[in-house]
Each structure stands twice: as C-alpha cells, then as structure tokens.
Amino acid sequence: MSEERETLREKLLSPRKNGYDRIKAEELQAMERYCGLYKTFLQQGKTERECARVAVEVAEKAGFKPYERGTALTAGDKIYRVNRDKSVMLAVIGRESLAQGAHIVAAHIDSPRLDLKPNPLYEDSELAFFKTHYYGGIRKYQWVTIPLELHGVVAKKDGTVVPVRLGEGDEAKFVITDLLPHLGGEQGKKPLNEAVPGESLNILLGSCPSGEEDEKDRVKMHIREKLFAKYGITEDDFTSAELEAVPAAQPTDIGLDASLIGAYGHDDRVCGYAGLRAILELTSPAKTAVCMLADKEEIGSMGVTGMQSAAFDTFMHDLCDGQGVPLRACYENSFCLSCDVTAAYDPNFPEVFEKRNAAFVNYGVGLCKYTGARGKSGASDASAETVAYVRRVLDEADVLWHISELGKVDAGGGGTVAMYMANRNIATLDAGVPVLSMHAPFETVAKLDCYMTYKGCKAIYEAE
C-alpha cells in the first residue's frame, strides 16, 4: 500500500484500538494509584449511606465545606451538601457566572441488593431467617449460596439512629440456601428467572436455641438476644430500619496480569468515585463544576434522594440565587455527563451484542448517545452537537474513549439518570465504564477504563 493511501485511510477510518496500545507509559503508575484508592472506597462503602459518608470524609480532607443557604461564594470555593445521608452534591465555584452554565457529572451510589422486610425475623424448623425484598434488577439465582453481610441503620422511636455492620472481616457471615442437585430436578426445569422466587431469598441467621426447652421459637429468641446485646434494638425497631444484605466479597484484582478489578457495586460506584475524585482535585475551573452522587437510580431515581427529586434543583437554585442568576438560565447553558456504567462485550454471550457498536474492556470510556429499550424508549438521546462537544473535550485531554450501545436493538435495554437531567433542559450525554457481569453480586471492570473515566470527568469539569 502506498504511503499516500495509508495516510488517507488513517484520516478517513477510525479502527478501534486497545487502550494499552495507546496509553502513555507514565500513566500506568497513576492508573494503579487511582485504582488502589477506588478499591478502598468500595471496601468502605457497600451501601449508599456508607458511600455518602466516605465521600464527605474525603471531600472535607480536600478542603470542601458544608454549604449553608445564603453563604457568599467566590471562584475556587469548594462546597458540598448532603441529602438525608444518602446522596451528596459537591461544587467548585467557577470563574464565570452561573449564567454561563455549569459542568455537571451525575452518577449514582446505590447498587442492587437485598433489603430486609419491615417484619423480617422468623423461625422455621429450628432455623432463624430474615425475609428480604430485592432492590433493583437482580438475577435472583446469583444471590444464593454466597457469603453476605448486613449493613444499614435502625432508627428508634426516640430519634436515635443506630448504625449496623454485621459480617465484616472475620465475623460470621450470612447466606441464602439452595437446593442440592440430587433433589433439584423440578427446579431445573423452570426458566432461569423463576427457579429462585423472590420470596425464597431468605437469609439464614442461626440455628442455636436459647432459654428453656419448653419455650417457643428459641432460635429466633437467641438471635433477638444477640441483636439487643450488640445494638440495643428490639423486634419493633425493624419497622423503622434500613438494613441491606450485600455480598461479603472484598474488592480484588482479577487476572494473572491484575489488569481488572472484581467487586460488588461497580454499578455505579466506579463512575461515582471517578466524578468524586476528579472534583476533589479541581482548583478554580472556568465554569462551576458540580458532582452529583445520587441514590435510587436502580429503582427509577424516585424519592427524595433520587435524581427526580427537587433536591438537586434546590442546591443549584441556591448557588444561582447567590449570583442573581435564574436557575433555568443556568440549566440551558449547562452540560451534564451522566456517568453510568455500560455493558462490556462478553465473548461468552455474543448473541446479545452488536459487536460494531458494543463497549469493550480496555478501550476507555464508553460513550452512549442513547440508552433505553427497543425504539430508544426511556432515552434522552443526546444531540449530535453534544456528542461532538464531548469528543473534542476528551480528545484534547488525551482521554481514551469509544462509542457504544448497551446491546442489540431488541435484546433488552436499560436506563440512567440522563433523561432526568435532560428533562431539566441540560445538554446531557451518557458515559461510563464497561462492566462484565453487570448487576451481579461480583462485577468486573478494567483498571484502564476506570482511570480513563476519572480523566474524562476531570476534563469535563475543566472544559471552557
């Protein structure tokens, strides 16, 4: 092939390349450092409350202050607001007026899990169990026979809130039992999504009785006594509790080359941490940078801590009010990176992916012009101009990225917070880390993609 022809091909075509063939050698150490911090974040935050608490802790160490309505702000000021201990909004005030808009990274810090029912504790056949109600789109069969922990809070009538963390470290774990294959013939004939009914996701708590032999429910009573001794909570207190069963597995490197990270909660804490870490490192951006760590995305972003709540609007209104800028005027000139994970192409399940438009591990940030299902139902569908803007910003910052869709057109679908940000008249584009085994109790991501997503968030914050 002639040199002229080869030059023309390079100009007109854009073949995808593995990120390790493109990343600068000096960035590999920075990538490992970043991923080490991310694994620590995952280890400390297995629920949305814990993630919010850790986010505030690291933000305060970076100089962020809690924002009180009416406080005068100047360029470079670093502030945050916590919404009901479950979501966090952080901002670094820009040099330009908010009339010129803000640059926002919105991610979520809730993940699929098993919540305890309001009246969860019972005994059957001298075994004690907790009843659960699954949260988010789980594949129920994946949650049986794996070690579990219990995290959350119990709110008492007197207003006391008791934090609960059971099963950590060397502590005894919990588990949901399953049928042995010798007796599982009928179960095996059922469709995968029916083989393990939601009502059978009961957590095994113990088997040791207490008290006298003629007492009723002695195993349940033994569990009650232990919970009261450790936390001072009674059976009635479960009525006002938020207790979540989460996988006990700790974040770990995956592969002989340690190029991947396996953990619970990559969706979407891998993007939430990217947005958080990037804003912590800002000094005085041109436009006000805002990081939104939302709750409730996995069940539709509803409720007071979800992205559909007015909490974000209230925070932004307070910032705009301090500059005499109408909120809607700020929104129409703002940009939001809806930072959420996407499905990584899995060669073990090629039938659900359209390979030319799939996200790949180690190819950098996966940009998604639209999500939704079937005919783009439930998608914000970013404009061509918005996608072009992000392309330019990422390229200028040497961020590796590739365009992607979730899967084949009629294979299924999914959604993010993008539509709720776009409904506010904020130009929005989805982008995030490609994930293998998304929504499983143990998901896998590539370190390179994690690092590039952090770089991408920082580039958006710093863009003119």
Positions of predicted regions on the chain:
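N-terminal hydrophobic/helix-forming segments and targeting peptides
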Residues: 1-464
